[in-house]
């Protein structure tokens, strides 16, 4: 039984992480899941939240994802995220501004499409803010 597996976290824009991991914790839709080497194969949706990565001989790395898919094979784990941002790169001011704009658009909606788009942006901004708070707590 191996002690590490290969992990890839990619978004539509870029590869965020590609390398060895001892374990990860990911925000699956059915709740947080912990993945260790030789885990049973699995394919599941993930929701917005933080993926915690424990790599050999390194500090934990935290990566915000806004949803996507998690595929687990015995020696390879892949996360295909809609959006993925390293925890330290999350911008609280930008997320607060996006939340404010989305709420304003929803309040003054001109079409159902505009309202739905603003609602999705509000959910994304709220999830980012929750991730920022969670990461801040973990560091203190």
From Swiss-Prot:
InterPro entries the UniProt entry points to: ATP_F1_dsu/esu_C_sf (IPR036794), ATP_synth_F1_dsu/esu (IPR001469), ATP_synth_F1_dsu/esu_N (IPR020546), ATP_synth_F1_esu_C (IPR020547), ATPsynth_dsu/esu_N (IPR036771)
Keyword rRNA-binding attributed: no
The entry's keywords: ATP synthesis, Cell inner membrane, Cell membrane, CF(1), Hydrogen ion transport, Ion transport, Membrane, Transport
Membrane topology: Peripheral membrane protein
SUPFAM superfamilies attached to this UniProt entry: Epsilon subunit of F1F0-ATP synthase C-terminal domain, Epsilon subunit of F1F0-ATP synthase N-terminal domain
Pfam families for the chain: ATP-synt_DE, ATP-synt_DE_N
Cellular compartments annotated: Cell inner membrane
Description of how the protein assembles with itself and partners: F-type ATPases have 2 components, CF(1) - the catalytic core - and CF(0) - the membrane proton channel. CF(1) has five subunits: alpha(3), beta(3), gamma(1), delta(1), epsilon(1). CF(0) has three main subunits: a, b and c.
Family to which this protein belongs: Belongs to the ATPase epsilon chain family.
Record's function text: Produces ATP from ADP in the presence of a proton gradient across the membrane.
Database matches in PANTHER family: ATP SYNTHASE DELTA/EPSILON CHAIN, ATP SYNTHASE EPSILON CHAIN, CHLOROPLASTIC
Stored HAMAP family: ATP_synth_epsil_bac (MF_00530)
Name used for this protein in its record: ATP synthase epsilon chain
Lineage: Bacteria, Pseudomonadati, Pseudomonadota, Betaproteobacteria, Nitrosomonadales
Gene this chain is encoded by: atpC
